[in-house]
Amino acid sequence: MKLITEKKMIKYLDLTTRALKKVKIEKNLSKKDLKRAKIYLEMSKNYLSDAKHFKKEGNWVNAFAAVNYSHAWLDAGAISNLFDVDRDNIMFTVDSD
């Protein structure tokens, strides 16, 4: 399939929105890691905002790219142990144990 369908767009916007709500910055991080965690979180929020803007403008290719970048920042934070995602390996690329 070579199309970004409305169903797929809604699915990924919803998934990333829910994932963003679930993320918590890990406790007891070093100053450096806390700064990094906040940057990752801000980048994710910014890309999600961009995705919604692009979708509203009818630019679905950039919207789909932006929502995937948004989620990638969340995954990066989870994999790096900057974010507590409650070992959710459905919404995030992490081990469940």
Regions found by a protein language model. Give the residues of each.
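Long, charged/polar, soluble alpha-helical segments
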Residues: 1-97
